[in-house]
């Protein structure tokens, strides 16, 4: 990646997000994902996906990747931040697969995401072909792993799902998209597919909390939760909560 990359991003300060909860009041979420190490290209990627309901999940995936692999490459950090990009754009594979481990769905989702990400990077001045290739490879493998950083990305995706998306599986149950047993199965799948041993240690408490919520899904308040999850400026602490 060239030093002359001409994308500006505001400086942010802070550390990892605090414990996950369902509160949707903006002040409690302000700046949870601040990171002074975020690059201009990463910030540009967030702008590209502005309003995507998975932005919190993507930010948390990047955090988990860096926690699992402190020497994470720039390619891994960016891939973590864009791995589900295709869901932002209409026309993708169904978001209601009958099985969460269905390779046909997982590969279609991963390939489509990689294509969108590669096209995005192709338009950015200063991004080298090798960087694009490595990011594409990681996005292609984010559901199945394969190689050290791909395994880290898969585990980071799982940990982030368990941490930040229980509200989504509760929403599935509340809206009738999936029965509670299927929602629980999604969390179980995300937990058990992880390879790094330390990821399982981090994941078990998150899994137990998510299952506990699903057992009482009808009573879980979700007002405003999707909006918070879609607002990267709020999550990075880049603007006041009065603007929400």
Descriptions of predicted regions:
Residues 7, 14-15, 19-32, 47-73, ...:
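Divalent metal-dependent phosphate-bond-processing catalytic cores, especially two-metal-ion Mg2+/Mn2+ enzymes
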Residues 61-64, 108-123:
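An active-site-proximal "capping" alpha-helix that borders the catalytic cofactor pocket
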Residues 27, 31-62, 88-106:
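Active-site flanking loop/helix segments enriched in acidic
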Residues 128-132, 146-147:
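Short, structured loop/turn "capping" segments at alpha-beta junctions
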Residues 123-129, 173:
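Inter-helical turn/loop segments and adjacent helix faces that build the functional surface
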Residues 69, 74, 105-109:
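Secondary-structure capping and boundary motifs in well-ordered enzyme cores
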Residues 2-8:
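Extreme N-terminal basic, low-complexity initiation segments
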Residues 74-98, 113, 117, 133-144, ...:
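His-Asp-centered metal-binding catalytic motifs of divalent-metal-dependent phosphohydrolases/nucleases
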């Amino acid at each position: 990646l060239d030093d002359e990359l001409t994308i500006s991003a505001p400086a942010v300060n802070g550390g990892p997000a605090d414990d996950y909860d369902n509160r949707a009041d903006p002040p409690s979420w302000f700046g949870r994902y601040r990171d002074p190490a975020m690059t201009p290209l990463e910030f540009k990627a967030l702008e590209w996906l502005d309003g995507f309901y998975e932005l919190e999940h993507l930010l948390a995936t990047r955090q988990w990747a860096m926690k699992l692999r402190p020497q994470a490459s720039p390619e891994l950090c960016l891939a973590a931040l864009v791995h589900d990009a295709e869901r932002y754009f209409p026309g993708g594979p169904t978001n209601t697969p009958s099985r969460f481990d269905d390779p046909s769905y997982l590969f279609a989702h991963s390939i489509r995401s990689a294509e969108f990400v590669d096209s995005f990077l192709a338009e950015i001045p200063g991004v080298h072909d090798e960087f694009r290739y490595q990011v594409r490879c990681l996005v292609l493998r984010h559901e199945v792993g394969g190689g050290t950083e791909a395994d880290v990305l898969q585990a980071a995706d799982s940990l982030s799902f368990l941490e930040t998306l229980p509200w989504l599986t509760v929403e599935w149950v509340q809206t009738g998209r999936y029965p509670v047993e299927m929602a629980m199965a999604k969390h179980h799948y995300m937990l058990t597919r992880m390879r790094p041993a330390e990821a399982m240690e981090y994941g078990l408490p998150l899994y137990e909390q998510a299952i506990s919520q699903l057992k009482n899904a009808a009573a879980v308040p979700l007002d405003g939760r999707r909006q918070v999850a879609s607002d990267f400026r709020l999550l990075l602490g880049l603007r006041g909560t009065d603007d929400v």
